[in-house]
Swiss-Prot record:
<feature type="modified residue" description="O-(pantetheine 4'-phosphoryl)serine">
    <location>
        <position position="37"/>
    </location>
</feature>
<keyword id="KW-0443">Lipid metabolism</keyword>
<keyword id="KW-0276">Fatty acid metabolism</keyword>
<dbReference type="GO" id="GO:0016020">
    <property type="term" value="C:membrane"/>
</dbReference>
<dbReference type="GO" id="GO:0005829">
    <property type="term" value="C:cytosol"/>
</dbReference>
<dbReference type="GO" id="GO:0009245">
    <property type="term" value="P:lipid A biosynthetic process"/>
</dbReference>
<keyword id="KW-0275">Fatty acid biosynthesis</keyword>
<keyword id="KW-0444">Lipid biosynthesis</keyword>
<protein>
    <recommendedName>
        <fullName>Acyl carrier protein</fullName>
    </recommendedName>
</protein>
<comment type="function">
    <text>Carrier of the growing fatty acid chain in fatty acid biosynthesis.</text>
</comment>
<comment type="pathway">
    <text>Lipid metabolism; fatty acid biosynthesis.</text>
</comment>
<keyword id="KW-0597">Phosphoprotein</keyword>
<dbReference type="Pfam" id="PF00550">
    <property type="entry name" value="PP-binding"/>
</dbReference>
<keyword id="KW-0963">Cytoplasm</keyword>
<dbReference type="InterPro" id="IPR003231">
    <property type="entry name" value="ACP"/>
</dbReference>
<feature type="domain" description="Carrier">
    <location>
        <begin position="2"/>
        <end position="77"/>
    </location>
</feature>
<dbReference type="InterPro" id="IPR009081">
    <property type="entry name" value="PP-bd_ACP"/>
</dbReference>
Length: 80
């Protein structure tokens, strides 16, 4: 597991109070992990803070799964 992946899992476990085993790359933040719209906004804000990036709203709305979060962050951090 990459460092980015581990940080994403840790953030999701903390914010959504789910078991780490539930946070798979295929897990949908809303449908599988129970995040509501406010939870998702809080997750995005925490990803921005931890990874020191800005995630535009038009891009954030396309991020639905844990795998998409990791993929997006890896791409953005590689651009820095």
């Amino acid at each position: 597991m990459s460092e980015i992946n581990q940080k994403v899992v840790d953030i999701i476990v903390d914010k959504l109070a789910v078991a780490p085993a539930e946070v798979t790359l295929e897990a949908n933040l809303a449908n599988d992990l129970g995040a509501d719209s406010l939870d998702i906004v809080e997750l995005i804000l925490e990803f921005e803070r931890v990874f020191d990036i800005n995630i535009p709203e038009d891009q954030a709305e396309h991020i639905k799964t844990v795998g998409q979060v990791v993929e997006y962050l890896e791409k953005r951090l590689a651009e820095k």
